A protein has these predicted regions:
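Interaction-mediating elements
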Residues: 1-127
Length: 127
């Protein structure tokens, strides 16, 4: 169960934010094989000054169209799967809603399975 956070500036429409969430989810299904119904996302728009980023970090020019994607998921994916996931997210967001590849910043956070609770305060994956 990946938990996805997407953060954008207010200039993006609610429809664009939904399309971004759809593109990230599609990439998770295709690249690392999560079940299609396994969708948990927090999609947020922020006022100017509330989403802070370096417009030229590592020589990559970013605009106000920047999209932050943070995916928290269980450990266990190979480096190849992670690279495929990153590429699929960028490809999907470029297709719809037309996000520039330079504006997609992705952070993968891996946690051990016993750190998840899916309800009732129980660590369902703990053995």
């Amino acid at each position: 169960m990946p938990l996805v956070r997407v953060d954008v500036l207010e200039g993006r429409s609610p429809d664009e934010l939904t399309e971004i969430g759809d593109g990230v989810h599609r990439a998770l299904v295709e690249a690392i094989g999560i079940p299609a119904q396994d969708r948990f996302q927090v999609l947020s728009r922020h006022q100017e000054g509330r989403l802070v980023f370096d417009r030229h970090y590592l020589g990559i020019a970013r605009t106000d169209g920047v999209v932050f994607v943070q995916i928290t998921m269980s450990v266990g994916r190979s480096l190849e799967q992670k690279k495929n996931l990153l590429a699929a997210i960028v490809r999907n967001l470029a297709e719809k809603p037309g996000v520039r590849p330079e504006d997609v910043l992705i952070n993968l956070v891996e946690v051990v399975k016993e750190n998840w609770s899916f309800g009732h305060g129980i660590a369902q994956y703990a053995s």
